[in-house]
Amino acid sequence: MVWFKMMSAIEWAEKYRPRTLGDVVGNRKAVQDLRKWAEEWQSGIPEKRAVILYGPAGIGKTSSAHALAGDMEWEVIELNASDQRTAGVIEKIAGSAASMNTFFGGKRLIILDEADNLHGTADRGGMRAISGIIKSTLQPIILIANDIYGLTPTVRNICLEIKFGSVQSRSMVPALKKVCESEGVSCSQEAVLQIAENAGGDFRSAINDLQAAANGKKALEAEDISTAGRDVKENIFKAMQKIFKSTDCKRALESAYGLDESPEDLVHWIDENLPIQYARKDGDLEDIKTGFGYLSKADIYLGRVKKRQNYRMWRYASMLMVCGAALSKTRPYPGFIKYQQPSLWRRLGQTRSRRDMRDNIASKIGEHSFESMHYSRNNLLGFYSILLKDEASAVELTANLGLELEELMYLSGSAKVSKKLQKIYDEAQNLLETKRDRTEEQEFFKAPAPAADDKQATLHCPVNIPEKEGNASAEKPESPGPQSPERKQKTLDLGFDTPQKLPEKKRSSEMKLPENPEPAENNLFSLSEPLPEKGPIPDFAGKKSLPELEEEKPSLSPLKKMSPANKEASKQGVKQGASEKGSPAADTQGGMEDGSKKAEPKNQKTLFDF
């Protein structure tokens, strides 16, 4: 047997991978069928352009595909589970490779490993793309799968199926001895045989166990090998055979517990194959009736598991379905039976696209009618199907729901696109385009017009602040208001739309206040006129003095005005009362009459204290 070596740092399973089909251990019949299919490509395109290699893991399926490429001198393009295998990726890589010849005119082998694991969002549409590529490929394609039923019936029907079985222990022993010799490890016959038996038909696992046992050793004996064995999952078809052929409930349950199947899945397998196994030529259905009686009771427990979320009831359901199927027969049923995959799963796979479309339509109807998708699917789909029969309302209904042409076909119950449906769909698209243009136009006119200047116009109120003498050269912040040649102004921003930064306060040492500022209640001057630096307050109220303005104020009583005599008497009374109390009110009043000095009120803030 020819083996090739690579770097010693890698695993032995990779280091001693077979280079040709003659190096493959076991499965001689499968290898011969694979070679025969490859030779048909030498004379043209065969009837089956793709082949499916299926069987348990670790028995040489992928190695056989690469060994075939080595024998035929084909280039290899491989996609495995670590790659994203959506429809777009498969069509881009495998599709382009399958439709073009190589530069030198040879063949190119396309290998899709773990093809039965095309599930989920990451591989959406991958199986459909594979089916389309196989039908039109100009290059050989090999699909590798552990479970043949993980592939769709469409793919299986257009491919050649080649089954790889578990490798027998006696076939592994010579190959394992060859590996020991190449690595310089002395292995006894008993040790190698023990490793082969513990592998459970998985040759790759046997090589890995040999490498682990021989690590750091020059000799390997049977005592160095663990006898625990591997936890090998039971094959579903072998388990079905043990369940239906057995008359021992315990043995049947052990086969069921070794399966990688839940009781919800196992009940469908038994339901599908029980009438096939217990079918009698004389037409007696008593065994089938008894078996389905136990199966119905098991289904009741499975329903309680879902309803109560009590998974301990799985034990009772498994016992009823397995033991009931095994013990319901009244006589043995010899002969080979080809067990079938549950037909319910096949029907669900075939109708998956239609169920997805139904749910999508129900979701659109629920959004439009403010109902849940479940309610719309069960109660409103038929009603909307009736509405679509009227062509006038069908156009608006299609536009409002946003239905696609395939969804329109589903609601109308049509298997193909008719002229009527195409017309409804086209008019609905035109209606949507018109509504879209109208909405954009309304949004355009609702939008505010852009400002002429980047800075919005704001209300400015100039306030004159006297400069400190001898500090005329000090820098002042610029103001958008008008500037006086004698004094610079600071403006107070009173804009309401976009608040502006307020001017910095002047320190008290930089401000020169008037000697006699007017109290706040008498400040009637306009803020837009400059303040005097010295001297009396100018006349800001239409050329009238404050005493004259006081006389024009309305009296407290609207019925009677104070006469000049009463006014003079009131002033004299104020003077007399102030003099009796020793208050300087008389001096203050006198100062107000002659327009001279005015007393500054205590604790009274002026305009400059902002």
Curated annotation (Swiss-Prot):
Protein role: Part of the RFC clamp loader complex which loads the PCNA sliding clamp onto DNA.
Compositional bias of kind Basic and acidic residues: 467-478, 502-515, 594-603
HAMAP family reported in the protein's UniProt record: RfcL
Start and end residues of each stretch annotated as Disordered: 467-610
Name this polypeptide is given: Replication factor C large subunit
Gene3D superfamilies with a match to the protein in the record: 1.10.8.60, P-loop containing nucleotide triphosphate hydrolases
InterPro entries, A to Z: AAA+_ATPase, ATPase_AAA_core, P-loop_NTPase, Rep_factor-C_lsu, RFC_lid
Binding-site residues for ATP, renumbered to this chain: G55, P56, A57, G58, I59, G60, K61, T62
Coiled-coil annotated residue ranges, if any: none
Database matches in Pfam families: AAA (PF00004), RCF1-5-like_lid (PF21960)
Subunit note: Heteromultimer composed of small subunits (RfcS) and large subunits (RfcL).
Membership in a protein family: Belongs to the activator 1 small subunits family. RfcL subfamily.
NCBIfam families: PRK04195.1-5, PRK04195.2-1
This protein's UniProt keywords: ATP-binding, DNA replication, Nucleotide-binding
GO biological process: DNA replication
Organism of this sequence: Methanosarcina mazei (strain ATCC BAA-159 / DSM 3647 / Goe1 / Go1 / JCM 11833 / OCM 88)
A GO MF term: ATP binding
PANTHER family xref list: CHROMOSOME TRANSMISSION FIDELITY FACTOR 18, REPLICATION FACTOR C SUBUNIT 1
